[in-house]
Amino acid sequence: MLSYITTYGLILFYYSLFLLAIATAYKSGGGQLKDILTEKGEPGILFMRLIAGIFFLGLCTATISAKRNITSEVFTPAWCEYQTQLWALIAAAIIMGTLSASKEIFPAENSKHSLPLYFPLSFILVRTLFLIVYEFFFRGVVLFVMIEDLGVITAVMVNLILYASIHWFDNRERYGSVIMGIILCEASIYYQSVWPAILIHLSFALSHEIFLIINNKSLIKKSWS
């Protein structure tokens, strides 16, 4: 079993590497999907950020979950136990994600900007894997290890600080990420599983991003010409 120093040292080490990857992506102007759609970034930079998150956070999650003997129920979905309130939250997340995407500004129709044919499907697949690993790290390993060591209140507070710091580079997400973080932590604690947080996060993020891509389908068509 890992000591406290080793456990939190690993968490901070891999978290810092991921934070550095995010900062680099934002500095290069390609940290988010909207940067690609508005001609401010390159797909490669966005994929680099996502893959870095999968690698760094995934490696940390695998190492700590194995050495700290976290109960398998934390990482196992229990579909029959999920109550109506959770499905209502998921539905609300989809609606909010879709509505927020409808307010985004897109390139003009006469823009010469185009996206590679592989981009939509590959982005959705990589993004889905990223969000699952992301929640395994934040609402799985970090949250439940800290609850065991430090108690619920401290664990949630630290989780929110780490989570909000990831979103600090986008001033539109800074404060919303705190609210989202509270919801995701509470859902995970209530069900003693990371999967409710995964479902809520996937529902909000993917509905938003898929709608953005659909609204920009003309960019995909241009790549045929």
Model-derived regions, located:
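N-terminal, membrane-interfacial amphipathic/helix-forming hydrophobic leader that caps
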Residues: 1-76, 154, 209-225
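Residue-identity detector for glutamine
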Residues: 32, 83-85, 192
